[in-house]
Swiss-Prot record:
Source organism (scientific name): Arabidopsis thaliana
Annotated stretches, region: Disordered: 266-289
Lineage: Eukaryota, Viridiplantae, Streptophyta, Embryophyta, Tracheophyta
Name of the featured protein: Phosphatidylinositol 4-phosphate 5-kinase 8
Claim: Transferase is one of the keywords in the record: yes
Transmembrane segments: none
GO cellular component: membrane
Coiled-coil spans in chain: none
Molecular function GO terms recorded: 1-phosphatidylinositol-4-phosphate 5-kinase activity; ATP binding
Amino acid sequence: METRPAERVFSNGDVYSGQLKGTLPHGKGKYAWPDGIIYEGDWEEGKISGRGKLMWSSGAKYEGDFSGGYLHGFGTLTSPDGSVYAGAWRMNVRHGLGRKEYCNSDVYDGSWREGLQDGSGSYSWYNGNRFIGNWKKGKMSGRGVMSWANGDLFNGFWLNGLRHGSGVYKYADGGFYFGTWSRGLKDGSGVFYPAGSKHPSLKKWHRHFGYDDTGNFLLSHNSTINIDDLRTSKAVSRSLSELTTTSGLTRTSERYPDDYWSTSDPPRDFMHHGPSSKSARSVDSGQSEIRDKNPIVFEREYMQGVLIKERIMSSIDMSHRARPLNLTKEVTVSACVSFLGGKWNHYLMLNLQLGIRYTVGKITPVPPREVRASDFSERARIMMFFPRNGSQYTPPHKSIDFDWKDYCPMVFRNLREMFKLDAADYMMSICGDDGLREISSPGKSGSIFYLSHDDRFVIKTLKRSELKVLLRMLPRYYEHVGDYENTLITKFFGVHRIKLKWGKKVRFVVMGNMFCTELKIHRRYDLKGSTQGRYTEKNKIGEKTTLKDLDLAYEFHMDKLLREALFKQIILDCSFLESLQILDYSLLLGLHFRAPDPLTDILEPPNEMSDQESDSVGSVDVNLPREPSIPPKGLLMVTHEPNSVNTAPGPHIRGSTLRAFSVGEKEVDLILPGTARLRVQLGVNMPAQAHHKLGQDNEESGTVELFEVYDVVVYMGIIDILQEYNMKKKVEHTCKSMKYDPMTISAIEPTLYSKRFIDFLLKVFPEKA
């Protein structure tokens, strides 16, 4: 049907002048609504489609592409306040590459998703500050570089608009701080290099974050957006199947209300980011004035922005010692070398995921029932061959051919259900697209460790002897875990074996991660109660190092009832292990140090933006006083309220909420000011006071402990429970007893091991005086 020019006036006051196809606008035309909104441009069978210009009575204006009645393609929106967005749109929302100039002269240049900054982008503040890096849902998240107008620069990781993870802070005077941050504050170990001292190479950091070795920013391809260039890109298309009538032109879904330009702006929840505070600069950059031939450097430990420990060293000493931190990666990931190496280790990971997905999918439809004796037998196995090209029962995959064996599947299904683990969630955690992360082994076993992407599960390779012990103890283990919901013993959720094409067999066990928490674990200890060889060399201690018995410089004071519940369960668990002739187990202890709440108002940024600010990202300088010498309370126990708890328990927790003597023997929650409200359970979220043992630090080491008492949140569990007191251990005991005191070595008779273990922990967690 041919188009013809016409002019139509509708009963509601709308006016259209232009080409029609039948009764529908088609071709070029102009449409005016009674409230002053005007569209002029292309139409397609009654829909605004093609190129056009849309003007609001408020003064807002859009010029660019439309599709099916929506802003869709590339175009420029000018708001009444003077802000201008030029870039990609999808269904009335900024989506794709675009540049926004805010009314206060801030500029964002980069990727958008669903109306918010998301992906790579550059944000320049009117005061000269600038950020280049990754964004997520409108906030700085991932890798990025922030430079301040005063010359300071931070190069590292971000989360929700805050410095979070490893990074390097460069001061304007030339000093550097290499360390870790948590929610915008220094948190954990780090090293400060005053100006003039020799520091680690920054080239890798510079290349990772998009600026050259001199520190000059290198703009990415999207630093300047040209609409003509963008129009050559393939626009996002969407099926528009809705039929439109002439009266349909007046519907609100197609008219773009007068306040559209404001409602589509990003939310006003950005954070301010100033350079390092004056208190921090007085500690760090003030020392950068040291410029002798052998300047000192400072090893430091922070607790939510509060400096708690410092060790003074020379830069020469630092250059000859192992790096204490792995700063070129996110803090959560650390690689280790396996016997398979490279791609074979990757294949092993893929095989593990394929096998677990197959096993869980096969066992889940089986009707629930109690376990039987036959479920523990040698015949209780699921076996399957996984050829690369797939089979009648298995999908094709990109790994190598392998044989899969799953041990006692019904037993482990019931164990997972005992801990309320949904089968679908379990598979998604381990077998999801995000995959597994390999983590460094904390011990001497040579095992490979994997961590699920959500940190809920740890997967460890087993020796053949360990597998045999686990299968022998499994009936008793199942009974013990069922009888004692508060048990601290490692939670096992699956045991598997992979046989590779050249005959190599690799055995795995899936366990709950005892440190599955949003809180940062500042210290980790592996405590056995023995002393022979139970220390870590100072130059090998890093951010993620698991320390040992002789490294423990604290004793922990707990609420009376919490302590009673703890040792009641420890004694029960040790009796169970003793009855199985198990030794070499240890208490894995994780500590989260709390900075006192009153300090949060006088520490480093962040500071929230005031309501008067625009939707641009704020940037202010914060003047902070120096750190106080005595920290007030950093946590608080209150009566348990189930609906008020912020976080769900990890997969290793099944027990009830604990009662505290100090709260009237009621069930309790733990409040961490400004962070969370947590349910207190045995081994999880347990509050305590860590008392530093005087004289523990060697004066010659130059280490200064700034406080004597800290509030801590404690996480713990009993691990490494698969070593029997066999002939090999008896021989080890005999040989070492000739050289050392028999009670100081690890390999002793299980009854003595259990008693020594408990006695040692009674000293670590003493009764309050």
